[in-house]
UniProtKB/Swiss-Prot annotation:
It is found in: Cell membrane. GO terms for molecular function: ATP binding; proton-transporting ATP synthase activity, rotational mechanism. Pfam families: ATP-synt. GO terms for biological process: proton motive force-driven plasma membrane ATP synthesis. This is ATP synthase gamma chain. CDD domains: F1-ATPase_gamma (cd12151). Belongs to the ATPase gamma chain family. One of its GO terms (cellular component) is plasma membrane. F-type ATPases have 2 components, CF(1) - the catalytic core - and CF(0) - the membrane proton channel. CF(1) has five subunits: alpha(3), beta(3), gamma(1), delta(1), epsilon(1). CF(0) has three main subunits: a, b and c. Keywords: ATP synthesis, Cell membrane, CF(1), Hydrogen ion transport, Ion transport, Membrane, Transport. The lineage of its organism: Bacteria, Bacillati, Chloroflexota, Chloroflexia, Chloroflexales.
Amino acid sequence: MPSTREIRRRIRSVKNLAQITRAMEMVSASKMRRAQRNVLATRPYADRLLDVMGELTGRAVGMRRGTLLEVRPVVKGVALIVVTPDRGLAGSLVANVLRRASRFILDEQEKKHTVEVLAIGKKGRDFMVRTRQNLVAEVTKLGDYPRLTDILGIATNVINGFLSGRYDEVYVLYSQFVNTLVQRPTIKRLLPIDPPHEPAERMVDYTYEPSQEEVLRALLPRFVEVQLYQAVLEAIASEHSARMVAMRNATDNAKELQRDLTLSYNKTRQANITKEVSEIASGAAALAEM
């Protein structure tokens, strides 16, 4: 049985750990709220951009070939953008995303497709290197509040790759923020773009300058960039949410362990007192018999 001194030392250690995890929980909660606001702030722009593209593609018939709208009959090259955190301590979030990435890559390889991976985040980058996947680009250290310009390199890479024929399809894998307790690994196709088509009776007769085709060609890359940026923001909100929950669970477990150790300490202390009293009583009885 451990001594009372050893148990007291363990109680202090667990108490200090609980204070650390509680502080990390509070920090993650604050960052999660700001990350959620960032996600919501981008949605009006993305929704309006989607509406305009639906209007334009409905009018610019036959403009798919040679653009980011072109659906190719035979798929040979596939790009997968994997969005993960730079840091751990986020529960099973990273493992779930990487497990989904491995399954996607395996499925595409079984179809005889060449898969190239572009990693956003250290965890995904390290996993792809460790498993010897075809990693062609990486972006790390985006921080908690990345800007659109931070992901333009990756976006430009896949856009140029698609237009050159290197990629026939481009996907992004990220952790979708559902709510504080649920973050879902999600794969979304970025390219070719499949915008909604407005019914003819709902179309408004806008005038576009210099032309509908030119405006559409300019908007298509912006749409890909915004979609990728939204995926990154969703992943960051999911990361902070998962870390907050993980740290809360760690704090609760530490407090429970502290209670168990305190109970063990009291039992050990009581046993020592009982032993000392018994020894004193035995000594007194021995003296009385002399």
